[in-house]
Regions:
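N-terminal Sec/ER secretory leader and immediately downstream segment
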Residues: 13-92
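Solvent-exposed aromatic/hydrophobic patches embedded in short alpha-helical segments
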Residues: 26, 30, 34-38, 104, ...
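Mid-length scaffold segments of soluble, non-membrane domains
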Residues: 78-145
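Sec-dependent signal peptide recognition
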Residues: 1-3
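Non-transmembrane, aqueous-exposed alpha-helical and coiled segments at domain scale
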Residues: 12-24, 113, 197-200, 214-219
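An amphipathic alpha-helical core segment
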Residues: 134-182
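A cross-kingdom marker for long, charged
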Residues: 178-219
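C-terminal motif of bacterial Sec signal peptides marking the signal peptidase cleavage site
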Residues: 6-9
């Protein structure tokens, strides 16, 4: 039995009576569920929303109506990447699911009390670089010729604006689109994983697993 002091306007004490084994079970349970939810959201965000432009490169979209032909090139780029995503996402799903199931928690009780997304934080800490590397390696198999056309058109426009009006615009320079997209997808994955875990751990569910409900105080 773990006795925890909670800080507030006055000090109170509450009893946390879930064992390490129960906490470990509950954390893995919500992590698995959060991963399932995250993968569904992520697939939608990088296919149905038709972006494939990271926040760091959003300046391209901001100027898209001013750059001749770039809307068409952007459409072709997103269509190409959407088709490719259908091929690699199944492998990504299997990979992250396996990592989540095999993740070890050093102190499950402490993790339950630390934050509402401590399992996702541990997943990111332990496997963040591995997931980034996996996405990067996978994206290297994509056809990037459409991106090369987008970059060439955008860079030509920036040079023209500078020559004619002395106007400076962000440059793509030597942007590696594989590195950029891998970082973006990994960021979205962990962002959604934390949000999904938080929702599962703070929302009462009449059909919830009894052990999980007990550990997170939802019973």
């Amino acid at each position: 039995m773990l006795v925890v002091a909670l800080a507030s306007s006055c000090t109170t004490t509450t009893t946390f009576n879930s064992s390490q084994e129960e906490c470990d079970y509950a954390l893995h349970y919500v992590l698995d569920k959060a991963n399932e939810s995250t993968l569904s959201k992520l697939f939608f965000r990088i296919t149905e929303t038709q972006t494939f432009i990271s926040d760091d490169l959003s300046f391209i979209l901001q100027h898209a109506d001013e750059i001749p032909g770039i809307r068409k090139l952007l459409d072709e780029w997103t269509q190409s990447m959407s088709r490719y995503t259908l091929d690699w996402f199944e492998g990504f799903t299997t990979y992250t699911t396996s990592l989540a199931k095999g993740l070890q928690f050093d102190d499950p009780q402490k993790m339950v009390l630390e934050s509402d997304f401590s399992a996702a934080l541990t997943m990111e800490s332990v496997y963040g670089e591995s997931i980034l590397s996996y996405v990067k390696t996978t994206l290297k198999g994509a056809d990037l010729t459409k991106w090369d056309e987008v970059a060439a058109q955008y860079n030509a426009w920036t040079k023209t604006r500078m020559a004619m009006y002395g106007e400076e615009n962000p440059s793509l320079g030597d942007v590696d689109i594989v590195d950029d997209m891998a970082a973006y997808i990994s960021m979205l994955y962990f962002e959604d994983l934390k949000a999904s875990e938080t929702l599962l751990r703070t929302t009462p569910d009449p059909n919830a697993d009894p052990t999980v409900a007990k550990v997170f105080g939802l019973d």
